[in-house]
């Protein structure tokens, strides 16, 4: 018999591995950054829940849309690093969400496509 946390962590690990697999196919330069996101999820209690929430926000708002071809982010590794640097112990994720909004705005701006 396993604990509830074990089941939740198992589900998270499976998703993390899936994101690594997608990075290998879609943006190999981002593999190391995606692997390193695992260090965001650690500890117990509030710290653990906050790290997991921040991880899901970065994956859902940057990595997954990039891998799906919805977000034209050419340097996902740098975007993940920037988002991780903005992650603070804030349950509302204000700093992280602001940083992600800026990253997404830069990626979708006409100037971003002119540089390519």
Which residues make up each language-model segment?
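C-terminal amphipathic alpha-helical interaction region
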Residues: 1-116
